Amino acid sequence: MAAKKVVKQIKLQVEAGKANPAPPVGPALGQAGLNIMEFCKQFNERSKNQMGLKLPVVITVYSDRSFTFVTKSPPAALLVMKALGLQGGSATPHTVKVGTIKRAQLEEIAKTKMEDLNANDMDAAVKIIAGTCRSMGVNVE
């Protein structure tokens, strides 16, 4: 059997367990001619253990209108805000600091993100997350 032809890839960020046909999911999938409710059911089932987090999802659309999707780990900035209990980062990160994060918290976030990061080892992953923290106005200890 020949491999299916990939027509399109759609990248979205959807809250775990709360995918529904409303924007942004509905219009993006509708344009590709996909069954929106089928995606919503599968995504909600797969992501129900990560409720409350926005998950990046990459949907691969095939020529026969079937699809597959891969959920990634939540954005690093979201995990940092959750760890520190923040609503958002600093508008001026180099002058106004909004919090301080410890090395242990960075390592925990890096473990969660490791499969999606372009890092060879844990130390490199921690440095990537630390850079995200600095750009948000969070001090790194």
Curated annotation (Swiss-Prot):
The protein's GO terms of the molecular function aspect are: large ribosomal subunit rRNA binding; structural constituent of ribosome
Q: Name one GO biological process term.
A: translation
Entry comment on modification after translation: One or more lysine residues are methylated.
**Organism domain of life:** Bacteria
Q: Which SUPFAM superfamilies match?
A: Ribosomal L11/L12e N-terminal domain, Ribosomal protein L11, C-terminal domain
Give the matching InterPro entries.
Answer: Ribosomal_uL11, Ribosomal_uL11_bac-typ, Ribosomal_uL11_C, Ribosomal_uL11_C_sf, Ribosomal_uL11_CS, Ribosomal_uL11_N, Ribosomal_uL11_N_sf
Range of residues in the leader sequence: none
Mention any one GO cellular component term assigned to this protein in its UniProt record.
cytosolic large ribosomal subunit
- In UniProt terms, what function does this protein have? Forms part of the ribosomal stalk which helps the ribosome interact with GTP-bound translation factors.
Q: Which family would the database say this protein is a member of?
A: Belongs to the universal ribosomal protein uL11 family.
Family matches, as NCBIfam families: L11_bact
On assembly, the entry states: Part of the ribosomal stalk of the 50S ribosomal subunit. Interacts with L10 and the large rRNA to form the base of the stalk. L10 forms an elongated spine to which L12 dimers bind in a sequential fashion forming a multimeric L10(L12)X complex.
What is this protein's record name? Large ribosomal subunit protein uL11
Q: Which organism is it from?
A: Leptospira biflexa serovar Patoc (strain Patoc 1 / ATCC 23582 / Paris)
